[in-house]
Amino acid sequence: MKQLGIDAVIDLHGVLRTNFLKFLWGRNFYQIDKGRNEKEKLIKGKYFKQLKTTHQRYLDVFKNINYNLNFSKTVFPKKTNLSGYAITNKIDFNKKLIGIAPFAKHKAKTYSLEKMKEVMESISKEHTILLFGGEENEGKQLKIISEGNENIFSLAEGFTLSDQLDFISNLDLMISMDSANGHLAAMYGVKVLTIWGVTHPYAGFAPFNQNSKYSILVDKNRYPKIPTSIYGNKSPEEYKQAINSITPEEIIKKIKEII
């Protein structure tokens, strides 16, 4: 790196290997403050308040090297033209286009698929639904759901990530867990309804530029230890189904409020 004549290093990751790089580099190394101590206090229940968002933490790194950046004039990518996709011949674009990404990496962050199917059945009466997923097993489950409803389409099989992003850019609303699809939709300026289980937006990981009202949370009085972890990978056994205390009716009501 020194041979390349680099003036400074910006580290937006803040992990062990970049800390090692910081030690070797020794100068003009600007690193993200991930707020680990604050987050630790949050999950231990020492306090319960909104922490700085991850987006703001990224921005702060650039401000430290005198880049005058802010979120006041946010520009999002334009919607992608979907005419090249054969599936669009079956989609009624006169209806609102709602994306649903019903899966997450950890089970304690994943809403019951049976309950989500109730949501789908209700809102598909008036709107078009696109289903997003990744793994092979997810794709099979979503295909079965879509085959039983003419207003529900699965993009989990036969569509690359790039393809899925094209469709995400055209959504009127994305419904997701605390997972990647919600963040991807937010990057296109799409409204995102996030369903939270054992994690919480106070940790700073809510999708970018979203109204706080676009979150459905588990009852904190019933599950006072939430957030049990930052990423949803740790939770008491009795909390693993906490997300399913949210009713389909709550989700349907919130969808109607947003769109």
Predicted regions, residues:
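Catalytic machinery of carbohydrate-active enzymes
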Residues: 1-259
